[in-house]
A protein has these predicted regions:
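Conserved, structured core segments of small domains
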Residues: 1-130
């Protein structure tokens, strides 16, 4: 028996700005089509809901808390959700169907790491070797 491995969960980050040349009507049609597409993906078990993000936020670091994010950033993060796929490539193919991509938005997709952070394991936030 050759059973397919269980799907992996990926985080999707929606970034960017709408094309300046697109009309509000075109953008609204893309948004409406997105919600139809998204609900179909959720119903089919390929996505899990996330959320749009509000405009205001804060940056928190050891230096303290400052206002942000800033709208002049090159690629504003507008929201997030989750994709269930068997590979990063499959996740990207699913996301390529997002109707909003035609109007300037970009989706970043990253596999979620189920392991607890470890300073000795090589990960996205591991310090460079000394």
């Amino acid at each position: 028996m050759n059973a397919k491995a269980p799907a992996t969960e990926y985080l999707v980050i929606s970034r960017g700005h709408w094309d300046a040349s697109a009309s509000k009507e075109d953008i609204q049609r893309a948004i409406d089509a997105f919600y139809v597409w998204h609900e179909g993906m959720v119903a089919g078990g390929k996505m899990r809901r996330g959320s749009r993000l509000m405009k205001d936020g804060k940056f928190v670091s050891r230096r303290g808390v400052i206002d942000g994010p800033y709208s002049e950033a090159k690629e504003v993060i507008g929201g997030y959700w989750f994709v269930q796929a068997h590979s990063l490539e499959e996740a990207a193919l699913l996301l390529a169907q997002n109707p909003c991509l035609a109007y300037g938005l970009v989706n970043e997709v990253r596999e979620l790491d189920p392991l607890q952070c470890d300073a000795f394991a090589v990960t996205a936030e591991t310090p460079a070797a000394a």
